[in-house]
């Protein structure tokens, strides 16, 4: 990030709120997720200092929204932070991690919000002992990104996954769990490997499948054909509006697991293709899909 000049501090009058879990919360990346964390943290723990690091145009919007107390476009402002949240895109988080020990001078808990975990956990292994890294992934979001779409209730009732490494600091994990529970989220812990395997199936595969489906349908049907489509196609392809740049990073950092998930889907599609006339595979796949769909909806309370 450019010049490293701190922007003006902005601390309007606050309500007393809850006693802070962390005193100085540094958030690198004030997009949809980072911005929502900032908004919620300032509401819930007004005695905490929320420090935002991003481009100056983003910081200016964040200050107008009262999402942060201190703004800077350089990570040196994180020197005294006791919690650092890396909420930038995955590759940028990896770059920030490499220099974090130079910017954060004291002891701190460090976490991230990326959708893949093994790469960032491996990179964090090089951090000094005073910086305790525990990977994180809030399973919340919205159709549109950017701090202008951030909401303090973004994480209410949503899972927030943590991926502690072997021999992790149990006290740091408990503080992080308390922090995200304060944001309204439901903290859960699993290994980095299991996280990436599960997310490949429940998130990454659906995204690639929907994007591929919309590509094939659009190329075949064109404008005239799409004008005849019903609500089903719109509902099914909602994820096709997702930005490619974010998903390229996701695929690059979870290629093996996503590849396995794609292989599983391709195998079923081949079954269906080979059995179109008799319909045996269609019966089996539809029956299984109906049952798993009911399970999905019941788990979501729908």
Ranges and model annotations:
Residues 152-238:
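Internal alpha-helical scaffold of NAD(P)-dependent oxidoreductase catalytic cores
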Residues 24, 49, 132, 159, ...:
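Residues at the starts of beta-strands that form the adenosine-phosphate
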Residues 96-150:
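Rossmann-like NAD(P)(H) cofactor-binding subdomain of soluble oxidoreductases
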Residues 75-109:
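Rossmann-like NAD(P)-binding element
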Residues 222-290:
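Interdomain hinge/lid region at the active-site interface
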């Amino acid at each position: 990030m450019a010049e490293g000049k701190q922007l003006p501090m902005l601390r309007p009058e606050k309500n007393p709120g809850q006693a802070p879990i962390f005193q100085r919360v540094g958030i690198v990346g004030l997009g949809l997720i980072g911005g929502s964390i900032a908004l919620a943290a300032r509401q819930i723990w007004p005695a905490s200092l929320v420090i935002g690091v991003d481009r100056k145009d983003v910081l200016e919007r964040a200050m107008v929204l009262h999402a942060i107390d201190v703004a800077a476009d350089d990570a040196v402002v994180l020197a005294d932070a006791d919690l650092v949240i890396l909420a930038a895109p995955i590759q940028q988080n990896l770059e920030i991690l490499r220099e974090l020990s130079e910017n954060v001078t004291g002891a701190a808990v460090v976490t991230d919000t990326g959708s893949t975990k093994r790469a960032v956990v491996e990179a964090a292994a090089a951090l000094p002992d005073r910086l305790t890294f525990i990977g994180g992934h809030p399973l919340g979001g919205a159709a549109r990104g950017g701090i202008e779409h951030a909401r303090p209730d973004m994480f209410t009732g949503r899972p927030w996954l943590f991926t502690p490494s072997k021999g992790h600091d149990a006290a740091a994990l408990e503080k992080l769990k308390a922090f995200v529970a304060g944001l309204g989220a439901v903290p859960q812990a699993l290994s980095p490997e299991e996280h990436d395997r599960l997310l490949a199936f429940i998130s990454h595969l659906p995204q690639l499948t929907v994007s591929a489906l919309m590509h094939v349908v659009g190329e075949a049907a064109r404008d005239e054909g799409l004008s005849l489509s019903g609500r089903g196609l719109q509902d099914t392809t909602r994820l096709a509006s997702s930005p490619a740049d974010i998903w390229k990073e996701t695929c690059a950092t979870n290629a093996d697991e996503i590849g396995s998930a794609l292989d599983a889907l391709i195998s079923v599609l081949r079954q269906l293709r080979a059995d179109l006339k008799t319909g045996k595979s269609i019966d089996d796949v539809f029956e299984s899909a109906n049952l798993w769909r009911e399970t999905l909806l019941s788990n979501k309370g729908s």
